[in-house]
Structure formats: C-alpha cells, structure tokens
C-alpha cells in the first residue's frame, strides 16, 4: 500500500472516531441520568487529544509521501 493511501486510511479513521464520539454525545444529551456529564468530562478531552494526535501523525505521513 502506498504511503498516500495509508494517509487517507488514517485520516478516514480519525474522522470516523470524531464523528462517532460526537454522535454519542448528541445521543446522551437527551438522557435524564447524570451519565452525560461524566461522559463529556472524561471522554471529550480524550477524544480531542486522540483526534489531534492521529491528525498530526497523518500530516507527517502526507508530508513525507511521494507521488509515484
């Protein structure tokens, strides 16, 4: 697999993690329990950190890839 294709694969995975997290937070918004607050407090920073880390690694892969 070419590095550029690997970069697109990692980028797609990154955005899918972000979209699944946002959809989960949206679903929990209408929940009456206090689970919503714990999920936002604990998972939102971890999700954003993971998204930034994978996006940075992906940008490094794109920067070092060569068109063949």
Curated annotation (Swiss-Prot):
The SS bond pairs are none
BP GO annotations = fungal-type cell wall organization; GPI anchor biosynthetic process; Ras protein signal transduction
Q: Pathway, per UniProt?
A: Glycolipid biosynthesis; glycosylphosphatidylinositol-anchor biosynthesis
Name the predominant localization. endoplasmic reticulum
> What is the reported phenotype of gene knockout?
Defects cause hyperactive Ras phenotypes, probably due to diminished GPI-anchor protein production.
Residues annotated as transmembrane: 8-28, 34-54
**Is the keyword tRNA-binding assigned to this protein?**
no
Sections of the chain in a coiled coil: none
What are the protein's GO molecular function terms?
Answer: GTPase inhibitor activity
Taxonomically, the superkingdom here is Eukaryota
Q: How does it sit in the membrane?
A: Multi-pass membrane protein
Q: Where does the record place it?
A: Endoplasmic reticulum membrane
Q: Which UniProt keywords apply?
A: Endoplasmic reticulum, GPI-anchor biosynthesis, Membrane, Transmembrane, Transmembrane helix
Which GO cellular component terms are attached? endoplasmic reticulum; endoplasmic reticulum membrane; glycosylphosphatidylinositol-N-acetylglucosaminyltransferase (GPI-GnT) complex
Give the quaternary structure.
Answer: Component of the phosphatidylinositol N-acetylglucosaminyltransferase (GPI-GlcNAc transferase) complex composed of at least GPI1, GPI2, GPI3, GPI15, GPI19 and ERI1. Interacts with GPI2. Interacts with GTP-bound RAS2 in an effector loop-dependent manner.
Function as written in the Swiss-Prot or TrEMBL entry: Probable component of the GPI-GlcNAc transferase (GPI-GnT) complex in the endoplasmic reticulum, a complex that catalyzes transfer of GlcNAc from UDP-GlcNAc to an acceptor phosphatidylinositol, the first step in the production of GPI-anchors for cell surface proteins. Ras may inhibit the enzyme activity of the GPI-GnT complex via the association between ERI1 and RAS2.
Protein name, UniProt field:
Phosphatidylinositol N-acetylglucosaminyltransferase ERI1 subunit
Task: Give the organism, scientific name.
Answer: Saccharomyces cerevisiae (strain ATCC 204508 / S288c) (Baker's yeast)
